[in-house]
């Protein structure tokens, strides 16, 4: 099959499959997200301009950096691994992120995660009962996240959580349908981290080479404040300045990060 013509900014990436059982699904994904369709991943060796490859492998979508194969592949997995461990043993409503968004007895906010990425924090909030709308502007990241959510819906342990997560592929907060009416807008813009775990270092390296620096992060705060009903929560490294240098209403400090909380109005107390 000849490759599907993709938009110019995606010319350095293609989508293929490892096992033929995934070939039809890989074709559908390439068409849905407008990626070049590669066919079998072995064909990448004949296309020297390719820098990245999305591959269907064991029924999951993965991202690889072709010139650094030792980095391995990135995929979204809400069923096993670190995300599953955090869901089971992460501390429930006592977690700092739950406090930051105002989650409490009788109030489970609708959270718009406007920098969804791989969806880890969104999944934590969804597992605590929040309704999540996820906004991701990069098609590669959105495709990975969408695949992870859809696979999670097929797993009986996390299907209810995944069904609480709605993904929007869009370029900006200004484009978000006002009918969504989030209680809280959550922001976690990319920021150069000093200390990284091996996994985070791998992901940051691949994503920064793929999407570049997050130069417009400061521009997120004002539209987020306009959209949120009660508050905006910004996750920052502990050493980073506040987003747009705007002092938050309060901060929740952790070991390496903090949550800056910008309160618009008090969350109403539940009626008892």
UniProtKB/Swiss-Prot annotation:
InterPro entries: 16SrRNA_methylTrfase_J (IPR007536), SAM-dependent_MTases_sf (IPR029063)
Catalytically driven reaction(s): guanosine(1516) in 16S rRNA + S-adenosyl-L-methionine = N(2)-methylguanosine(1516) in 16S rRNA + S-adenosyl-L-homocysteine + H(+)
UniProt EC number: 2.1.1.242
GO cellular component: cytoplasm
GO function term, MF aspect, one: rRNA (guanine-N2-)-methyltransferase activity
Alphabetized UniProt keyword annotations: Cytoplasm, Methyltransferase, rRNA processing, S-adenosyl-L-methionine, Transferase
Subcellular location: Cytoplasm
Binding site for S-adenosyl-L-methionine: 120-121, 136-137, 171-172, 188
Gene3D superfamilies reported for this sequence: Vaccinia Virus protein VP39, YhiQ-like domain
Broad class of where this protein is predominantly found: cytoplasm
Highest taxon of the lineage: Bacteria
Family, as annotated: Belongs to the methyltransferase superfamily. RsmJ family.
Protein's recorded name: Ribosomal RNA small subunit methyltransferase J
Lineage start: Bacteria, Pseudomonadati, Pseudomonadota, Gammaproteobacteria, Alteromonadales
